Structure formats: structure tokens, C-alpha cells
Regions:
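Short, basic/aromatic recognition patches
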Residues: 1-21
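Charged, gly/pro-rich active-site loop segments
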Residues: 1-5, 76-146
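Short, solvent-exposed coil/turn segments
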Residues: 7, 15, 31-33, 78, ...
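Alpha-helix boundary recognition
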Residues: 14-15, 60-61, 119
Length: 146
């Protein structure tokens, strides 16, 4: 399924140090929510995991995923801006330490070594293809706005 381009303010937020809330679906249909560092690679959102976690098992079974990414901005109506991304994910083995190191520069600062262990395992990279955007902010103008 073709995705939606990540543009403007949505891209800026996803490339910032805002931590995403990641929602996958458990086998019984209930939501599984975790927090994750995210980045952008072309028109995909990427995140990395070293151990094989529940979110990865959920995504292998059902690739639907949602992210909620808060900002610190309040709009003219007093609402906190946040981005919601609905999409599909694919999990690949390997590359997690390299992606985590790249993201660590954004989230922790330059010169940080992450993961903080010698010879980390290859882990997993999740690549998310956005299908649509929502939330409150310039990526989703309010109804009735010009």
C-alpha cells in the first residue's frame, strides 16, 4: 500500500527530540502502548529495538501501527499540539545499534555512545509507512479553518 509523504511541520516534529507513543495491537485486539525514539528515513518513520519485544511480535502478526507525538506548543485555542500517525510497519532484523546511535545524537546530544554496551546485538528496525496524519497542529488544520 502506498504511503503518504511526510512533509513540513510533521517531518520537523518527527526529526526532533519528541518521544513517540507507539501503539500496536495485542493478539486479543487490546492496545499495547510503548514510548520510543523515532526518526525519518525518506518517507518512512524508523525506530529501533535491541531485544525482541512485544511490539515487534504484534507487528509481525498485524502491521497496523499508530504513533502519537506531543509538542510543547499550544495553539491559538489553547490546545496542546500533537501529531498522530496511522500506518503500517515492517520489521527487519539488524541495524538497530546504528539507528540508535544516530537517534542518540538527537535525543541525548552529540558525542553520546548508544547503546551503552560493547558489541550490542543486531536488534530490529521497524520501518513505518504513514497512511494518514491527524492530531492538533499544522499537519491537520481544524475543520472550518481557512
Amino acid at each position: 500500500m502506498a504511503g503518504t509523504s511526510i512533509r513540513g511541520a510533521a517531518r520537523e516534529l518527527l526529526e526532533s527530540d519528541a518521544v513517540a507513543q507507539v501503539v500496536t495491537l495485542n493478539e486479543d485486539g487490546s492496545p499495547h502502548v510503548t514510548a520510543a525514539w523515532v526518526g525519518v528515513d525518506g518517507d518512512e518513520i524508523v525506530l529501533a529495538t535491541i531485544p525482541d519485544q512485544r511490539k515487534l511480535r504484534n507487528l509481525r502478526r498485524d502491521p497496523r501501527i499508530a504513533l502519537s507525538v506531543p509538542t510543547t506548543r499550544v495553539n491559538e485555542w489553547g490546545l496542546l499540539e500533537y501529531l498522530v500517525v496511522y500506518g503500517t510497519a515492517r520489521v527487519t532484523e539488524g541495524g538497530a545499534p546504528e539507528l540508535l546511535q544516530r537517534l542518540a545524537h538527537t535525543y541525548l546530544g552529540p558525542g553520546v555512545v548508544f547503546p551503552p554496551m560493547p558489541n550490542p546485538p543486531p536488534g530490529f528496525v521497524t520501518r513505518i509507512t504513514p497512511q494518514r496524519f491527524g492530531g492538533v497542529g499544522p499537519w491537520n488544520p481544524p475543520r472550518g479553518a481557512n
